[in-house]
Structures are given as C-alpha cells and as structure tokens.
C-alpha cells in the first residue's frame, strides 16, 4: 500500500483544482425563491456557500421571469381592452334599450291619449243618442192617444190615417201633407204621340153636349219600360185568383179542371200542353191562386168568371198585385173575344163580368133615366164589358144606381174621376169602384189620373154655375178626410192644425172650416170637405194650385174654388 499523505478534499466536484475565489459572485436570490436553508454541518470546509450557485443556473431563470412578466402585462392589457369593449357594448345596448323604451313609452302615451279622446267622443255620441232616444220616447208617449185612434181594430173596416207626429206643440210637427208639389204641371202635348193615352171624347147626343171637351188636351205620355220576359217579371200578370172554392177542392183537382176548361174554350194560345203551371190553395178562406204559363192565357181565364166547379160557381179575378199598366206591355189584358164559352156553359157578358176589383158603382142616377141613356153616358169612356141597371122587381123602374165594368180596365179610374160629383137634374152622381180601396190607382196612372181629375173638376164647376168657374177667396178640398177621422176630437184638432199650417204657406189665411159628423147620426152638409178662406184671390189661387193633387194621409187632394156666397151662408154641400 502506498503511503500517501492524507490531504483534505476541497474540490468543486470536478476533480480539478479548487475554483478561485473570483469565480464566485454574489447573486441575489430570485424574487419569490424560498430562503436558503441553514448550512448543514459537514466534514467539508465551507468554501461553498449559498452564494456559491453557479452562474449557469441563475441567468436562464431570470430571463424566463422577465418574459413571463411581459406576457402577463400583455394579457392584462388584453383583458383591459376586452373589458373596455364589453363596457362600450353594454353602454350601446343600454342606449338602444333606452331609446326603444322611450319610443314605446311615447307610442303608449299617444295610444292612451287617442283612446281617451275616442272614449270621450263615444261618450258624447252616447249622451246625444240618449237625449234623442228620450225625446223620441217623449214624442211617442205624447202621441200615444192619437195613434190609438189611428190604429183601431181592422174589424171596423176603416182606413185610418197613419200620421206619426208628436202631440207636443213645442217640437216640430209632421204634417199630414206630403212634400210640396212640382213647380208646374207638365205641359200637355199638342197631339197624341206614340205611347200617349188619348182621352175618349164623350158622344152623349142631346143629353150632356160638350160637357167633356178633352180631345184637345191629350194626357202626358205614360212611359212604360217593358220588363224582361222572365218568369218572375211576368208572374203578376200570369196569376189568377179563384174564389169560392168548395171544401173538397185541392191543388190537383183545380189544376186538372182549369186545364180541361181552357182547352175546351180554346184558351190555350201558348201551344199544346197544360195551361196551368202551379196552384196554391188557402183551404181556410177557400180561394186559390192559379199560375198560368203565359200572360195571354191568364187573360183568357178571366172569361171563366162564374164557371161551375164541383157544383159551386167560382169567382175568377185578377190578384191584388196585378198591375194593368205594366201588364199591358207583357201581353193582352183582355180575354180573346173568340173564346167558345158556350162549351163550358158560359155566355159572353154574363153577370160574372160584373165582379172584381174593377167593377164601378154608379149612384145618384135620375129615376127617369133609361138603360140606354145610362149606357150611353158610361160608354163615352170606352166599351163596356158588363152593365147592369138595378131595377125594382115589381115596378121595373130604375132604383137610381147601376154597375159596370169596362173592357179596358185602365179607364176605370179615369171614368170614376170624370163622372163623380156631376149634377144631373136634381141629382148628383156618385161614381167609384164598387169595392172601394180594393184597388187604388197605380203609380204609373197617377199623373194621367191627376190630369183627368183637374179637367173633370173644372168641367163640373163650369157646368154647375152655367159658365166659367171664376177664382174666389174660398178653396174647397175634397177627398181629404173621412167621417170616422172627424169624430175623434184629437184627430180633428190635428187635421185643423195641418190645414191651417199648410194654408198659411200660400198667403193670408182667414178661416178654416171642416164640417164634422153629427153624433146623433143626422146628415151634415159638407162632411169630408175642407174649406179654406183667404184674404185675397191671389192667395187662394196659389193655395188651389199648390194643394191640388197633393197627398194628405195617403188621400189625393182635389182643390177647387168655392162660391163665396155659399160659404158665407154656411152652405157646404154645393
């Protein structure tokens, strides 16, 4: 074993010479590094301290720490920028929401104001309507008594005036008169043009000469537009009323019977086949409506009036909705004169022809008038379909009245207007429809009828006074009111006030006289007439021209001058 001298080991672990003292430098410990542990006593010398870490170990760690801090600062800046952006975004969103909220609040305020305004207007309308309803109820309550008199039971058989107006004199009353007349009556044509209805000149030789000089003034043309030839348009002219049916009648038996009868008399003018299209029966009232296939066949059926059906005579009439003026444009309105009525036991011009709504009653005939004279008077307006002068069975003398039906039903109202009220000797004619109210003048006939009434009234007055009817201060209105209306005190008061208000429109009205029926039933002169006395002729002339032809409670007014001396003496039947 070699002998060596034992030396203490003070190396740096490299097996080399000990490092010089300058090779060690004091580096501060990195921030955050744990404090150096206390030196552990060893057998070595303390040449190596905590400051004796190598330079190679310290420098890289310090560089990484700087970069980490820079990255952290960059991240912090990025986060700050993100926070700023988020804050700006929230501010913008908050601003948008605030603006939306403001807009919504403004819209809601406007809507609330508009709704409030609408509610106020609606409340105002409701209040006004309430006031109007209250006023109407007051008027209805006030007028109840008068309406009661106008709406009496139909069983009394009277046509009541239906003028709804308040009894309260403070409110505006509704007059019984219609609207004011036209400014002037249309000028009359010099000659009868196509479509005009000429006046038939009377040809009463030696009895009433030149009484109706109407040939020089033809009527205003009646313009009738032809309707479309459809089933619905012609239905009113194709229907036939059949009354007085036996209880055993039904739709089938009526249809079969009329088909056979129409074929037997030669009335099927529309060709082969059945003439009846439909039958409707009212078993309670024992009548039927028979619908024919053509207007001409319906007119031919009119000749069957009075025919025997199952042992009972039946009435064949036009229905109430039949309009002769319109039907004239659709086909013949009269039966074919060549019908073979004898084949079914009928004769032309039999008593059956004197039935129906167009039958005329002629009363007030002088007893010494013969049948030929009365017929001559009536036929001055057209040929007659039927005529019957009623005579006493024992003596054979005339009873002073007759019935007739014209072949042309359109002249029915014309003849009534022209003949009614004419003085014949010591008698005054009463000429009207036998079934008064069953058939009123159609609207298409009113202008023609108005002119006829004007001419007739003028001729009647001229005939009565023996010369021209000079204007007077007194105007007489006829066909205005009925005796039944005059019996009721309230109704009478309303009529007087209506006449006074209407008369004052034309000038200085002095007096209104409306004769009333006697409660005991004794005859009173002038009942049904209204007399208006004016201060001057100018006012009375205006009133006559303005009120003539007007409607008062659905009655057509006839206005004429009345003699002042008779009015002053209280003679109201002139």
Swiss-Prot record:
<dbReference type="GO" id="GO:0071004">
    <property type="term" value="C:U2-type prespliceosome"/>
</dbReference>
<dbReference type="InterPro" id="IPR003954">
    <property type="entry name" value="RRM_dom_euk"/>
</dbReference>
<keyword id="KW-0507">mRNA processing</keyword>
<keyword id="KW-0539">Nucleus</keyword>
<feature type="region of interest" description="Disordered">
    <location>
        <begin position="1"/>
        <end position="180"/>
    </location>
</feature>
<feature type="domain" description="RRM 1">
    <location>
        <begin position="238"/>
        <end position="321"/>
    </location>
</feature>
<dbReference type="GO" id="GO:0000245">
    <property type="term" value="P:spliceosomal complex assembly"/>
</dbReference>
<feature type="domain" description="RRM 2">
    <location>
        <begin position="358"/>
        <end position="436"/>
    </location>
</feature>
<feature type="compositionally biased region" description="Low complexity">
    <location>
        <begin position="18"/>
        <end position="41"/>
    </location>
</feature>
<dbReference type="GO" id="GO:0008187">
    <property type="term" value="F:poly-pyrimidine tract binding"/>
</dbReference>
<dbReference type="GO" id="GO:0016607">
    <property type="term" value="C:nuclear speck"/>
</dbReference>
<keyword id="KW-0694">RNA-binding</keyword>
<protein>
    <recommendedName>
        <fullName>Splicing factor U2af large subunit A</fullName>
    </recommendedName>
</protein>
<keyword id="KW-0508">mRNA splicing</keyword>
<dbReference type="InterPro" id="IPR000504">
    <property type="entry name" value="RRM_dom"/>
</dbReference>
<keyword id="KW-0677">Repeat</keyword>
<comment type="function">
    <text>Necessary for the splicing of pre-mRNA.</text>
</comment>
<dbReference type="InterPro" id="IPR006529">
    <property type="entry name" value="U2AF_lg"/>
</dbReference>
<feature type="compositionally biased region" description="Basic residues">
    <location>
        <begin position="144"/>
        <end position="172"/>
    </location>
</feature>
<comment type="similarity">
    <text>Belongs to the splicing factor SR family.</text>
</comment>
<feature type="compositionally biased region" description="Basic and acidic residues">
    <location>
        <begin position="53"/>
        <end position="143"/>
    </location>
</feature>
<dbReference type="GO" id="GO:0000243">
    <property type="term" value="C:commitment complex"/>
</dbReference>
<dbReference type="Pfam" id="PF00076">
    <property type="entry name" value="RRM_1"/>
</dbReference>
<feature type="domain" description="RRM 3">
    <location>
        <begin position="479"/>
        <end position="565"/>
    </location>
</feature>
<dbReference type="InterPro" id="IPR012677">
    <property type="entry name" value="Nucleotide-bd_a/b_plait_sf"/>
</dbReference>
<dbReference type="GO" id="GO:0030628">
    <property type="term" value="F:pre-mRNA 3'-splice site binding"/>
</dbReference>
<dbReference type="GO" id="GO:0089701">
    <property type="term" value="C:U2AF complex"/>
</dbReference>
<dbReference type="InterPro" id="IPR035979">
    <property type="entry name" value="RBD_domain_sf"/>
</dbReference>
């Amino acid at each position: 074993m070699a002998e060596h001298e034992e030396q203490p080991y003070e190396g740096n672990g490299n097996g080399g010479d000990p490092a010089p003292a300058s090779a060690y430098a004091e580096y501060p410990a990195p921030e955050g590094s744990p404090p150096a542990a206390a030196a552990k006593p060893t057998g070595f010398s303390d040449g190596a301290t905590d400051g004796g870490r190598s330079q190679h170990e310290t420098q890289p760690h310090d560089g990484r720490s700087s970069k980490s801090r820079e990255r952290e600062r960059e991240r912090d800046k990025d986060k700050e920028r993100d926070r700023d952006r988020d804050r700006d975004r929230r501010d913008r969103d908050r601003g948008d929401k605030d603006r939306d909220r403001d807009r919504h609040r403004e819209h809601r305020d406007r809507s609330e104001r508009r709704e409030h305004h609408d509610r106020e207007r609606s409340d105002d309308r409701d209040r006004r309507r309430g006031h109007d309803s209250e006023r109407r109820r007051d008027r209805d309550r006030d007028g109840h008594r008068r309406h009661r008199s106008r709406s009496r039971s139909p069983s009394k058989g009277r046509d009541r005036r239906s003028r709804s107006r308040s009894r309260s004199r403070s409110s505006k009353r509704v007059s019984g008169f219609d609207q004011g007349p036209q400014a002037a009556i249309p000028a009359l044509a010099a000659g009868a043009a196509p479509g005009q209805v000429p006046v038939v000149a009377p040809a009463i030789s030696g009895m009433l000469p030149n009484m109706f000089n109407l040939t020089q003034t033809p009527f205003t043309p009646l313009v009738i537009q032809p309707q479309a030839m459809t089933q619905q348009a012609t239905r009113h002219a194709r229907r036939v009323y059949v009354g007085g049916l036996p209880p055993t009648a039904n739709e089938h038996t009526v249809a079969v019977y009329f088909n056979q009868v129409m074929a037997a008399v030669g009335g099927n003018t529309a060709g082969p086949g059945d003439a009846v299209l439909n039958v409707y029966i009212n078993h309670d009232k024992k009548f039927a409506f028979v619908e024919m296939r053509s207007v001409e066949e319906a007119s031919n059926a009119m000749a069957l009036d009075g025919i025997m059906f199952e042992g009972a005579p039946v009435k064949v009439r036009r229905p109430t909705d039949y309009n002769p003026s319109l039907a004239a444009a659709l086909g013949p309105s009269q039966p074919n004169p060549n019908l073979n009525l004898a084949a079914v036991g009928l004769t032309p011009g039999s008593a059956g022809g004197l039935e129906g709504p167009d039958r005329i009653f002629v009363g007030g005939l002088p007893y010494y008038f013969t049948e030929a004279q009365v017929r001559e008077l009536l036929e001055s307006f057209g040929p007659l379909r039927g005529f019957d002068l009623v005579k006493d069975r024992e003596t054979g003398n005339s009873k002073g009245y007759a019935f007739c039906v014209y072949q042309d039903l359109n002249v029915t109202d014309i003849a009534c207007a022209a003949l009614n009220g004419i003085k014949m000797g010591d008698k005054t004619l009463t000429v009207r429809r036998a079934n008064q109210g069953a058939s009123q003048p159609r609207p298409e006939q009113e202008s023609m009828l108005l002119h006829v009434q004007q001419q007739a009234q003028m001729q009647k007055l001229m005939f009565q006074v023996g010369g021209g009817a000079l204007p007077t201060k007194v105007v007489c209105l006829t066909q205005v009111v009925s005796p039944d209306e005059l019996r009721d005190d309230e109704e009478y008061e309303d009529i007087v006030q209506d006449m006074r208000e209407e008369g004052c429109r034309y000038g200085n009205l002095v007096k209104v006289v409306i004769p009333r029926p006697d409660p005991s039933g004794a005859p009173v002169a002038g009942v049904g007439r209204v007399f208006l006395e004016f201060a001057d002729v100018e006012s009375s002339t205006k009133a006559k021209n303005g009120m003539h032809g007007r409607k008062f409670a659905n009655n057509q007014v006839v206005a004429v001058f009345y003699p002042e001396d008779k009015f002053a003496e209280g003679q109201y039947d002139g």
